[in-house]
Amino acid sequence: MQNIIKNGKESNSVPLQGLGVDSPLGGEGIFYHFTFSEVAPTFAEILDFIKSTNLEEEHPAIVFIKEVLPQLNLDTGISGYYILKNLEELRLKDGLICIENIEFNLGRQLCGYIKEATQVALFVCTAGEYFTQLTNRLNEQGDIMEAYILDAIGSLTVEKAMDKIQESLKIKMLEKELKISNRYSPGYCNWPLSDQQNLFQLIGENPTGIALSDSCLMTPRKSVSGLIGLGKNLKLHEYGCKICNNTTCIYRRILHE
C-alpha cells in the first residue's frame, strides 16, 4: 500500500482511484492530494504570468480573476505521485540513462545535471479535470480572454503543487543523507516528449488519474511528469534556459521573465 498525504498529513488509507507501485528501493510510491487553497497562485503571480501587472481594478481581466478564484475551491482533483527507482546507468557522452533496462534520451545537458545521482524519483502531478472543463466551457462561449487566464492559473497551480511535493521529497531524502536535483520533464530542457511513454510505463498504475495519449500528451491537460535525481554527492544545478531551444517553456516564463 502506498502512503497517502492529504492536506499535508500522511496516512495509510487506500485511495478510491487505485494503488501505486512498490519501489525497488524498499520504499513505496507516495500520493499527495491538495485543496486549491493550499496551492493557489497569488493574484500577483497570475498577473505577472499573463504579463498584465499594470491593469486598472475595473479591467475585465482583474474582474474575472476575482470571480474565478473562489470557484476553483471546488476543484478536488489536484494531486501528485512519485515513486523511487534505481538509476542503473548514466552515459553522459550519449546523453542516456537506463532505469530497469529502459533507456531515456535525456541529452547531455540533463545527464550532466544528474550525473552524481544514484536514484531517481519519477513523478506525475495534475491540477485536475476541473480546469479542463471550465476552460473548454469558456472557449465554447467565446470567452477567449477568460479561457486564457484560467489556463494560466491552471499552469501555475500544478507547478505550485509540484513545488510542495518536491519540497516534501527533499525533506525525506535529507533524512537518508541524500540530496535532490531540480525536476525535469519530457518536452523540456531538450528532453524528447516521446520519452513520456517510457516514463509512464515505469511509474505504473497510480491514483492521480493522469492518462497518456498516443501522441504523449497528458489528460487532464494541466498535468506534469518527469524525474528528480537523488544522490549523496548530487549538486543542484539551475535550469539551463539560456541554452534551451524551447522558447515557449513555462519554466522559462516563471523563472526568468
Tell what function each PLM region has.
Residues 17-20, 24-28:
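Glycine-biased, low-complexity coil/linker segments
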Residues 142-202:
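Internal, well-folded beta-alpha domain core
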Residues 253-257:
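Short cysteine/histidine-rich zinc-coordinating motifs and their immediately flanking basic loops
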Residues 69-76, 169, 173, 245-248:
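Structural signal for hydrophobic packing residues in well-ordered secondary-structure cores
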Residues 176-251:
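Short terminal or interdomain "cap/linker" segment that borders an active site or interface and mediates
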Residues 57-64, 150-153, 157, 161, ...:
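Catalytic cores of large soluble enzymes that bind and process phosphate-bearing ligands
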Residues 2-9, 29-147:
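Active-site helix-to-loop segments that bind/position phosphate- or nucleotide-bearing substrates
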